[in-house]
C-alpha cells in the first residue's frame, strides 16, 4: 500500500548537522546507489540492531497502524517548501545524493530507486546517547510497551548526536511544535501561518510528542510517556516563537490538537548527566505561541478526558523554568489543587537508568525534586499528584460545612418514612392548624410572610408527655398533600422568616436535598412552639420536572402540608421519632380563587345507615357542586365511591348542605375512615376531608334534666321535655334489637329498625334520661301487656339468664353474643304478648306486684324513629323541679367490657343492678324501662 510521503528537495537545511555531514561521519551503513528502503516490518523488528540508524519516526498513515497513533490522513497532500527558503539556523547542506538518507539493501523490482526524495521519519531519541558518533540504546524504551502494541517503524532519516543537535546560541527548535524541529523550510512556513485544522486527523503534519489520543487504557499512561520529560525541559527559547508559550491567560484559551510542549526535542541524558549544550535555564518562557497550541475553555473543558495526560505534561514543560522548583510552581493557579497540604509521599516506581542496570531502584517515597534527570516511569500518574483536572468547571469551591445542629445520625429515619404521632406517653400534636391557603413566594420575589392560622395568629405545635429538662429540636419541612404516602414535596420548600415580629428562633438545614427548619422545643415553654418563622418557597417547575425519575407536574401539585417531626431520646439509648402533619394548604393563588374549599363541616362521624344532613362551610361553592364520598385502600386506590345528595335550594357560595350517603357495608364492627371532596368540574376539586362511619345497632341514651328544655329526635312526645346533661354516666356501648319483633309492648305498631352506635366521647356517649315519677302516677297494670317491675330487695342481684331476645337487648351479630343483658322480672296473664320461650325465662311462678309509682325509677329508651306513637299520655305534666343528688355512692353497675376496637367480649358478663335509695334520682336503663311500660299499661287502661 502506498504511504504518504513528504518530498523534500536535495538541499535540506539541517543547521549544525551540516558540519557533521561535511566531515563524512556517517550514522549508519552507507546506502548503495539506487537502493530501496526497508519495509516497515523489517525496520520495526530490526530497530535495536547497531547497524540500523535509529532516529525519530514520523508515523504515516499505514494500513496496519491505528489511526489514533498517527492521526494523518492519506488524502492530505504533502507540503513542498521552496528550495530557496533561507535556513537561518545553520549552514545549508550543499549536496549529497538522495540515497544517502535511505536504508540500503533493497531495490524495487524494476530496479528503480525507492524514492526520488528522502522520506523524513522522526522518532524519539530518548534512551540514546552518543558514543563514538553512533547511536546505541542504553535502555530499551520500547520495553515500556508490549510488543503487540508497538508502532512499527519505517524508513528513517539519521540525525546527528545530541551535542550537535542544536547550538545554544541559536533559536530553540523546541519552541515550535512543527514536526520538522530543525527550523526547516516547512517548519518556518508552518510557524508563520496558522492552518484551520481542527483535529490531528486533518492536520498535514505530525507532532513529535505523544498524541493526546495515544493513551493506552490498560496501562493508564500514554504510550510515549517514556519519551516525554516530566521534570521540565532544561531550557526555554530565549527568543520569540509564534505562540509557543502557554500562559495563565492562554491556559484556558483555544485547545489545540497538539500538546503545548515539544517534549521530545530536549532531553536529559539517561545516565543522570545534564547535557553540556544547556548549562543554564531560560529566565522566561516564550511570550508567543505557535499554531494550534493555545488551550481554550471550550476545548479544554470539552476534551478533558481525552487530553488529560498530555495536556498536563505539556503544561508542565511549557511553564517550568527551573527543574529544582516544585512542579506546582509552573502550573496555572486555576489548574492547581485547591488543597494546600502536600501528600506525605509520592508512590512512584522509578528506576535510574545508567550503565549499571542491576542497581537497586530508589525508595518509592523519594521526592521528585531530588532528581535532576528524567527517571523511567513504569506505572502511575506522576502529574496527577499535582494536578486535579476537574470533570466539571464549577467544582472548585469547597462544600459548605454542616453545622453541629444539623448533624443527623444515620440511624434516624428518613424524611419519607411514615411515623406515628404518639407513642407511649409522648404525643406530638398540632394545637392550632394552619390556614387552608397560603400564597407561596417564588425565588425571584420577596417573602410572602409566615404561614398563618385560620383563626388568626400562627400554627402551634406541642409535645405532650415529655417531662425531662432537656430541650428538643422540632423539625419542620414541607410535605405532600396528595393521595399517596406523605413525603417531602418536590416543588415547595420551607422558607425561614426573620424579622422584628418573629418570636421563634429557627435554623435552616439540608437533609437529603430537602430544606428543614429546626425549631427548639423548650421545657420552660411546656414543649410548645409558635410557628411564626416558617414560610413556603416555590421552586421552579422546570428545574424539578427535568430531574431524573421525577414524574410529578408542578402546576398540578400545589397543595402541601406542614410536617413536624421530633426525636425523643430514650433512657435505653434509642431515639423515639414522632411526626404529625397539618391539614392541606393550597399554595397557588389561582387555585385558591377557583377551587372549592371546605373549611368546616357540621359533623365528622355518623352511623353507616346515613341519611343525616351535613352542612359544609367554605368558599367557591356552586349550584352544581357535587360531593363525592370515597373509601381508599392503603395503596391509594378507590375501594368505594358514592355521590351524596346536595340541597341546591340551600346552596350558597360559602355553604353547602349535603345528605350523608349510606356506607357500602352495613355490618361493620369498628369505625371506618373515609374521605369526601367537593367537585365543581373536571379539574376543580377541593381537598379531601375526613369522615368516619360508625357501626350500627347501638341506641343513643342520654341523661337530660327537665328544666333544661332542648328537643331531641326521640320516640314520641316524651322526648320534648328532655335535654342532655353535660356529663355521661357510662361510656359502654349498649345494644338494641335489630328487628321490630323484639318490642315487648303489645298494642302498638313495631318500631322500625334503628341502628346506631355512640362512641365513648362526652359529647356523643350514651346518657340516662332524668324523668319525674309524677307523670306515671295513674298507671294500672293491663292484662293485655307485659308488666315489668323491680321487686327484688336492696342488695340482691339475681343472675340473668341468656335468652334469645331479652328486653331491650339483641345478639348484635350472628357470631357475637349480646353485650348487655338486663335483669327483669315479668308478671303477666296468659294473654300476654310475650313469646313462650321468653315468658318462661322472664316470668317467675309467683308474680310480684308492681312498686308504687312514686318509688319507681323511670327510664326512657331513645326511640327508633319519630314515626313511633306516643309512649306516654301526658308529658306536659312533668314537674318543673326535680331532686338531683349525683352522689358517687349510688352503687355499682357492672356492664360488659368493651375493647377499644368496638368489639365486646365473646362471653356475656352478668349485669348486677343495685336498687337505689328513694332519695336518689340516679336512674338506670332497667328502671326506666319498667316505668315506661307501667305508664303505657295505665294509659291503655284509662282509655
UniProtKB/Swiss-Prot annotation:
Ranges of Pro residues compositional bias? 276-288, 846-855
Mapped sequence repeat ranges = 203-219, 233-249, 282-298
Which GO cellular component terms, listed alphabetically, does the Swiss-Prot or TrEMBL entry include? chromatin; cytoplasm; cytosol; nuclear body; nucleoplasm; nucleus; transcription regulator complex
Q: Which GO terms describe its biological process?
A: aortic valve morphogenesis; calcineurin-NFAT signaling cascade; intracellular signal transduction; negative regulation of vascular associated smooth muscle cell differentiation; negative regulation of Wnt signaling pathway; positive regulation of DNA-templated transcription; positive regulation of transcription by RNA polymerase II; pulmonary valve morphogenesis
What conditions trigger expression of this protein? Only isoforms A are inducibly expressed in T lymphocytes upon activation of the T-cell receptor (TCR) complex. Induced after co-addition of phorbol 12-myristate 13-acetate (PMA) and ionomycin. Also induced after co-addition of 12-O-tetradecanoylphorbol-13-acetate (TPA) and ionomycin. Weakly induced with PMA, ionomycin and cyclosporin A.
Positions of the RHD domain = 410-592
Q: Which parts of the sequence carry Phosphoserine? A: 233, 237, 245, 269, 294
| Assembly behavior | Member of the multicomponent NFATC transcription complex that consists of at least two components, a pre-existing cytoplasmic component NFATC2 and an inducible nuclear component NFATC1. Other members such as NFATC4, NFATC3 or members of the activating protein-1 family, MAF, GATA4 and Cbp/p300 can also bind the complex. NFATC proteins bind to DNA as monomers. Interacts with HOMER2 and HOMER3; this interaction may compete with calcineurin/PPP3CA-binding and hence prevent NFATC1 dephosphorylation and activation. Interacts with TLE6/GRG6.
Please describe what this protein does: Plays a role in the inducible expression of cytokine genes in T-cells, especially in the induction of the IL-2 or IL-4 gene transcription. Also controls gene expression in embryonic cardiac cells. Could regulate not only the activation and proliferation but also the differentiation and programmed death of T-lymphocytes as well as lymphoid and non-lymphoid cells. Required for osteoclastogenesis and regulates many genes important for osteoclast differentiation and function.
Q: What is this protein called?
A: Nuclear factor of activated T-cells, cytoplasmic 1
Organism, by scientific name, is Homo sapiens (Human)
Q: Which gene encodes it?
A: NFATC1
